[in-house]
């Protein structure tokens, strides 16, 4: 006999009036004399299963009474439409098979502190809100990859262990690599994906990245996931157009397919509904002026001298002036990575942009036109105190058929936090890695 259910909660509407078997976990149970209401979740949704004592065997009713929170079971019964029921359907129970009992489940309806919940993250992901956030995360990832594939991009996987640093070694996790010296956990796949771009024209990589930043803010993780497209023969303007189309498509897909999850999270989607190209654009210079003009509106967003990078409060202040994501472009080259193309009309700034999400979620994308001149790139590598020999292969990309090209990296967790309205990024990844957390 197969253990597989004959239906799922997500497909239950097809089976009204029919007998089905569901398999899942007890999310909640209420007993009212001869009636027992079991809220069963199976990963695709939840449904109320009604056990009426006179309609089932004594054994089945006793099993229903014994069920505890998160017990796993198979329930067979008839599907009935009922607009009063959660989800609009109920299952009239005929039989229950207990598969795995659950004893004193630690996460109860009472309030638990964040530290307790994070220590039990392996169980917390079963809760309705965490489930909704992670379901939307999966949708964001699927939407991103499918959209890029439809646009002719090729997925190009890049290594996690690298011999060189893409943006300096300060924030890298290092490990010994046999007899070859140090290896680093990748902080980006960008340098390698540029090699793929020279082969395929339009590529992207997707995977985990690592930053050894001793940061405890609500926007930072030490391990997070990025998707990084790269396009040959594309300039800075092309790059921003690609980003706004990309982000708009992802948001539209989530609004279309994960509306129920957004409702579970009580997410106000008013601003999300307005996400469509073109996005507003301001320069770094204009952003500096905006910050000075609105001093005191956001705590910590103090005026900055030209040449300083923005902190989280500054990003929050800037984004608060727009109802959609906003590009801040042409940052000082000194605060950006060595590979960014200088503006030919103003070399002290780079042809780059950060895309800031509204509602205080900050930077979700960083991108730039890349330096394609080998002499200038070598000069920038030296200026950043990096060893030329570590980047010979990267310089080769400019020596053999160089072309102008651009790309960007989008942080999955920050996008998910913004779309779901989640205040802390730790809830947007199944098992967050933070400064003081590596368990479970």
UniProtKB/Swiss-Prot annotation:
Keywords assigned: Aminoacyl-tRNA synthetase, ATP-binding, Cytoplasm, Ligase, Nucleotide-binding, Protein biosynthesis
Disulfide bonds: none
GO MF terms, alphabetically ordered: asparagine-tRNA ligase activity; ATP binding; nucleic acid binding
Reactions that this protein is recorded to catalyse: tRNA(Asn) + L-asparagine + ATP = L-asparaginyl-tRNA(Asn) + AMP + diphosphate + H(+)
Pfam families: tRNA-synt_2, tRNA_anti-codon
Cell compartment(s), UniProt: Cytoplasm
Top-level division of the source organism's lineage: Bacteria
Gene Ontology, cellular component aspect: cytoplasm
Its EC number(s): 6.1.1.22
GO terms of biological process kind: asparaginyl-tRNA aminoacylation
Signal sequence bounds: none
EC class name: ligase
Summary of subunit composition and partner proteins: Homodimer.
Family: Belongs to the class-II aminoacyl-tRNA synthetase family.
UniProt-recorded name of the protein: Asparagine--tRNA ligase
Species the sequence originates in: Chloroflexus aurantiacus (strain ATCC 29366 / DSM 635 / J-10-fl)
């Amino acid at each position: 006999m197969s253990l597989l259910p004959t239906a799922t909660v997500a497909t239950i509407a097809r089976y009204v009036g029919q007998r089905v078997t569901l398999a899942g976990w007890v999310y909640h149970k209420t007993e009212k004399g001869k009636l027992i209401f079991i809220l069963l979740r199976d990963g695709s949704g939840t449904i109320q299963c009604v056990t009426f004592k006179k309609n089932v065997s004594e054994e089945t009713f006793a099993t229903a009474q014994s069920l505890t929170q998160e017990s796993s079971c198979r329930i067979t019964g008839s599907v009935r439409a009922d607009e009063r029921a959660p989800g609009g359907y109920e299952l009239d129970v005929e039989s229950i098979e207990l598969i795995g009992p659950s004893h004193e489940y630690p996460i109860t309806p009472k309030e638990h502190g964040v530290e307790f919940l994070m220590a039990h993250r392996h169980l917390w992901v079963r809760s309705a809100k965490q489930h909704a956030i992670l379901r939307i995360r999966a949708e964001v990832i699927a939407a991103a990859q499918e959209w890029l594939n439809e646009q002719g991009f090729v997925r190009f996987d890049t290594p996690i262990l690298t011999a060189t640093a893409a943006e300096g070694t300060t924030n890298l996790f290092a490990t010994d690599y046999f007899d070859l010296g140090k290896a680093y956990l990748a902080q980006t796949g960008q340098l390698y994906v540029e090699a793929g771009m020279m082969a395929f024209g339009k590529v992207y990589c997707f995977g985990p990245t690592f930053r050894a930043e001793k940061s405890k803010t609500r926007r930072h993780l030490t391990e997070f996931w990025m998707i990084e497209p790269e396009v040959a023969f594309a300039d800075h303007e092309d790059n921003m157009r690609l980003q706004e189309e990309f982000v708009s498509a992802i948001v539209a897909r989530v609004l279309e397919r994960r509306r129920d999850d957004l409702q579970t999270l009580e997410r106000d989607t008013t601003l999300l509904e307005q996400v469509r190209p073109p996005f507003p654009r301001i320069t770094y210079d204009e952003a500096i002026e905006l910050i000075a003009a609105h001093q005191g509106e956001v705590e910590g967003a103090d005026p900055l001298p030209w040449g300083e990078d923005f902190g989280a409060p500054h990003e929050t202040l800037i984004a608060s002036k727009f109802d959609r994501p906003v590009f801040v472009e042409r940052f000082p080259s000194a605060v950006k990575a060595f590979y960014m193309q200088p503006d030919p009309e103003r070399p002290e700034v780079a042809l780059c942009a950060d895309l800031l999400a509204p509602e205080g979620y900050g930077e979700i994308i960083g991108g730039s036109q890349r330096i394609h001149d080998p002499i200038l790139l070598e000069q920038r590598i030296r200026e950043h105190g990096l060893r030329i020999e570590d980047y010979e292969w990267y310089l080769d990309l400019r020596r053999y058929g160089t072309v102008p090209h651009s790309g960007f990296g989008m942080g999955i967790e920050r996008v998910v936090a913004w779309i779901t309205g989640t205040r802390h990024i730790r809830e947007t990844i199944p098992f967050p890695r933070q400064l003081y957390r590596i368990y479970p």
